[in-house]
């Protein structure tokens, strides 16, 4: 998890904006959304194969 420290003379909005940027760059939220629900390995394999087929077209 990214950590953000207040800089001297920085407003809360600027610090929050910097924190949000660091979180999006690190991919923490994307991974949390991806792991929100359990997906069986067989379903993961089907999805992977489906994506590969669509990318070949």
Curated annotation (Swiss-Prot):
Presence of the UniProt keyword Ribonucleoprotein in the record: yes
Gene3D superfamilies per the UniProt record, alphabetical: Ribosomal protein S8 (1.20.5.1150)
Keywords for this protein: Ribonucleoprotein, Ribosomal protein
Disordered, as annotated region: 34-57
Compositional bias ranges of the Basic residues kind: 43-57
Domain of life, source organism: Bacteria
Protein's GO biological process: translation
GO MF terms, alphabetically ordered: structural constituent of ribosome
Record-level GO cellular component terms: ribonucleoprotein complex; ribosome
Family, similarity comment: Belongs to the bacterial ribosomal protein bS21 family.
Full protein name: Small ribosomal subunit protein bS21
Organism: Aster yellows witches'-broom phytoplasma (strain AYWB)
Lineage, broadest ranks: Bacteria, Bacillati, Mycoplasmatota, Mollicutes, Acholeplasmatales
């Amino acid at each position: 998890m990214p950590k953000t420290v207040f800089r001297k003379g920085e407003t809360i909005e600027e610090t929050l904006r910097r924190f949000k940027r660091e979180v999006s760059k690190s991919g923490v939220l994307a991974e949390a959304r991806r792991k929100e629900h359990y997906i069986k390995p067989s379903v993961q394999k089907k999805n992977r194969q489906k994506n590969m087929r669509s990318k070949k077209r």
